[in-house]
Structures are given as structure tokens and as C-alpha cells.
């Protein structure tokens, strides 16, 4: 129980410190530097850092849901995910320099989280931390299936995740935050036994790339190319094109928003009309004045 309390305290302390640093960065830095760099670095740190507590499987999914729920409320739209930054670039929502700065910030946050993780384990605040410190150099791989199957699993997870983000990108955080948190939790529960369901290249590189069992190229195929492929497919399905690269819609036909006015349909030949009261019916070719010999 003491180890659990230490882990939970570390989890919430890391989140609180990152939130304080984010607010200070927002107040002190220029708007562009905060939105592109500091915000992403803080979210990457807060996403990776708390897991140094080494939680058991009984708490992992619950804390994962709470973490993503808090992200959606507090972190101003930061993603801490390179594929989300690349999605914004393909959607023409972010420039190339801004995207590169976000990727650099995510890399910096990942390194800071790894440093925090090793420091926490060195303190040996609990038996779990001591065990992790001893096993740090001989960790086991998170990839517990074949490389093609793992790449397919990561691509499917990323596809569902990014398609949900695209559908909810204009929704209020009160709706999008819980929906994304629930999706990530369900995905982690379903695909976790195969690849740990990272679908985040920065998170995967931090947690499992240094572990034995697979080569670096195999890790790249599963945890980088898989999520990238799923993201591109999600954008294509949602938009029908990659807006930053193609103007023409590749999948869906363009509907003309200007419609020609439709004429009033002519009455059928068998239809009869009842004349209004006081009106006379005239036959075509005859005048309205009766001749003297008419009967």
C-alpha cells in the first residue's frame, strides 16, 4: 500500500508541476513561442513523466483515462504526439516551420521525461522503483507479436484515434475530452497485449526502443510507420484528400452549391381544372365575344 501511495503521489505531483510550468510559460513567453514550443514540451513531459511511478495493471487504465481527460481540459490543445502535429500540417492548419518546432518540443519533452524517470527510480521511493532501476538496462520489449501484425495493430489504433480527432476538432472540450479519453482507454485495453497500444512515436521511442528483443528498424516499422500510415488514411477518409498536398478531392465528388431553378411541372393531360367562381372558360382560337349567330 505504501508503494501505491508513493506512485500516486508522484503521478499527481508531476502533473501539477507541469501545469504550473505551462501557466508560467504562457504568461512569460511570446504567444508564438508558447503555442508552438513550450506547450508541446510540457504536455510531452506530463504524458511520459508520471509513468515512472510504475503502476500495476489494475490502475493503469484508470489513470490513463484520467490523464487524457485532464489533458483535454488543461493543456490548450497540445498533443505531445508527432503524428497529430503531422496531421495538422497535412490539414493545412500548421506551417512547416511550426510543425518542425512542435516536433522538436516533443523530442525535448521526451528527453526530460526520461531524465525524470531515471531520477525517480534512483531515489528508490518504493520497492517497485528499486526493481525498475535494476531492470532499466535489460527491459523487455513492448512488442509481443510479429512485426507485420504489430504494425497493423498500431496503424488501426492510430486510424481510429485520428479519425475521432478529426470528427471532434470543432467540438467543445467538455465533449471531445471525455470521448478521446474513453477511446484511448478502450484502445489500450484491446490492443495492449500485442503492442501496448502506444500509437505515439514519441512515447514508444521513450519506453521501448532501448529494450532488447527487436532491432531498431523493426521498432521503427511498428511504432513510427504504423501510426503514420493510420493517420494518413484517417485524413484521406475524412477529407477525401490531403489538403496541404492536393487541392482535388481524390475520393468524394464535389457537389455544385449553385442549383438551377426548377420550373413548375405542367399538369397532366388527364387533369381537369374547376374554374373559379365568376370566371369563364375560353376555347383556344376563339375570342371572348360571342357572335350574333351563337346559340
Swiss-Prot record:
GO terms for cellular component: cytoplasm; membrane. A motif (NPA 2) lies at residues 200-202. InterPro entries: AQP11/12_channel, Aquaporin-like, Aquaporin_11/12, Aquaporin_12, MIP. Belongs to the MIP/aquaporin (TC 1.A.8) family. AQP11/AQP12 subfamily. Residues 77-114, 195-206 dip into the membrane without crossing it. It catalyses: H2O(in) = H2O(out). Homotetramer; each monomer provides an independent water pore. This is Putative aquaporin-12A. It is found in: Membrane. The gene is AQP12A. Aquaporins contain two tandem repeats each containing three membrane-spanning domains and a pore-forming loop with the signature motif Asn-Pro-Ala (NPA). Residues 257-295 are annotated as: Disordered. GO terms for molecular function: channel activity; water channel activity. A motif (NPA 1) lies at residues 81-83. Residues 22-54, 127-145, 200-215 are extracellular. It comes from Homo sapiens (Human). Putative aquaporin. Could form homotetrameric transmembrane channels, with each monomer independently mediating water transport across the plasma membrane along its osmotic gradient. Restricted to the pancreas. Residues 76-99, 167-178, 237-295 are cytoplasmic.
